[in-house]
Design a protein with these regions (language model features):
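Enzymes that bind and transform nitrogen-containing heteroaromatic metabolites
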Residues: 2-8, 13-17, 22-24, 63, ...
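A broad detector of short, well-ordered amphipathic alpha-helices
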Residues: 8, 12-15, 39, 50-53, ...
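Proteins enriched for Cys/Gly/acidic motifs involved in redox and nucleic-acid/cofactor modification
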Residues: 19-23, 112, 126-154
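Helix-turn-helix
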Residues: 28
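Zn2+-dependent cytidine deaminase-like catalytic core
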Residues: 31-130, 215, 241, 246-248, ...
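Generic structural signal for helix capping and beta-alpha/helix-loop junctions
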Residues: 105-106, 132, 298, 320
Length: 374
């Protein structure tokens, strides 16, 4: 086995922490001595030991003189855990192979520099593309302090998310729907508009056994969410946030008594200011959001510049219907050359359905975003 093979093993280990480590990154580590794998570890949960320490602790023999493969640059600062570079030095590791550099300002090359200063041979950028992709959520959050937002929708091949009657269960098959549940476990928050609550009364939880429910975020400008809706009735069991512009204390109190949190925000173009919402959620360590909104909220999110990724689940069906709903509504763009561009698309087959996952490429920051950063 070579460096890439061992790093692939470290990547597989890192993925075991999916859904549990946020707002920390997913990290895997492998200790190799004289061609033998003697230790493996991964960051299992936020606040617990990091991958490097777990790998070293699992070693079946003395790791002195061994090589450590780790998907992300070792940390060198005190947080909830002590610096991993200290553990590496104490163990007598001879060489470290790193997948991704850590953009966290508290690390950002310092971890590698410390190792080299102590005579450890460091190889950088082993399977960098794969290691970077693993932690795209963390990289976005640690550099912007705003959640990574993935717009998710299921549609027919003619671009409909419901029939003209509003019926939408089910567009995709069971395999695709199970994939969505894994996304709900993976993302820290799930966001919809009040229109989705009124139309579907969804529960918005993760239905995987042993999975983690995302924080539910409802964009509800005027507090129209029914008190008998599933999200309100279960708010004491699953964290639920109502993002609103309604400052009426009596209205707010009814939801608060049910267990909901109220975030009262500024109004922007008749709706909740999504940029302000992202800033507040980021401050609460919500590093990622699965946006399962309808066409109105999806357009507002794109227009605000908060969407980093689109996940389109496409079923081999045709609904037709001039009035059938589409994933993105709003005003739309005026000409094709000013469309929102998508890049780095990935295609995955899920039974008879397809998932297309793409990054959103904004040609420039929206004016409202620029103003918010001044």
């Amino acid at each position: 086995m070579n460096d890439k093979d061992y790093m692939r093993l470290a990547l597989q280990l890192a993925k075991r922490g999916c859904g549990w480590t946020s707002p920390n990154p997913m990290v895997g580590a492998v200790v190799v001595k004289e061609g033998r794998t003697i230790g493996q570890g991964w960051h299992q949960r936020y606040g617990q030991a990091h991958a490097e320490r777990n790998a070293l602790a699992s070693c079946t023999e003395d790791p002195q003189g061994a090589t450590l493969y780790v998907t992300l640059e070792p940390c060198c600062h005190y947080g909830k855990q002590p610096p991993c570079v200290d553990a590496i030095l104490d163990a007598g590791i001879h060489r470290v192979a790193v997948g991704s550099a850590d953009p966290n300002p508290l690390v950002a090359g310092k971890g590698i520099a410390i190792l080299r200063a102590h005579g450890i041979d460091v190889t950088e950028n082993v399977l960098q593309e794969e290691c970077d992709a693993l932690n795209k959520v963390f990289f976005h959050y640690i550099t912007t302090k705003r959640p990574f937002v993935s717009m998710k929708y299921a549609m027919t091949m003619d671009g409909k998310i419901a029939t003209y009657t509003g019926a939408s269960k089910w567009i995709t098959g069971e395999i695709a729907r199970n994939h969505v549940q894994r996304q709900r476990h993976r993302f820290r928050g799930i966001m919809v508009g009040v229109g989705t609550i009124l139309a579907d009364d969804p529960l918005l939880t993760c239905r995987i056994e042993g999975g983690r429910d995302p924080v539910r975020i409802i964009c509800d400008t005027h507090l129209r969410t029914p008190l008998q809706s599933q999200v309100v009735m279960t708010a004491k069991q699953v964290p639920t946030i109502l993002a609103t512009c309604c400052g009426d204390p009596e209205k707010q109190a009814a939801y608060q008594q049910a267990g909901c949190r109220i975030l009262c925000l500024e109004e922007h173009c008749g709706h909740v200011n999504l940029l302000q919402l992202m800033e507040q959620l980021g401050q609460e360590q919500i590093d990622s959001i699965l946006l399962e909104g309808g066409g109105t909220l999806n357009w507002s999110a794109l227009e605000s510049g908060i969407v980093q990724q689109v996940q389109a689940y496409i079923a081999p069906k045709l609904f037709g219907g001039r009035d059938a709903k589409t994933p993105i509504e709003g005003a739309g763009v005026s000409f094709p050359d000013v469309a929102f561009q998508l890049k780095n698309s990935r295609l995955e087959r899920l039974g008879e359905d397809l998932l297309i996952e793409s990054e959103v490429e904004y040609p420039c920051l929206p004016e409202s975003w620029k103003k918010s950063e001044q």
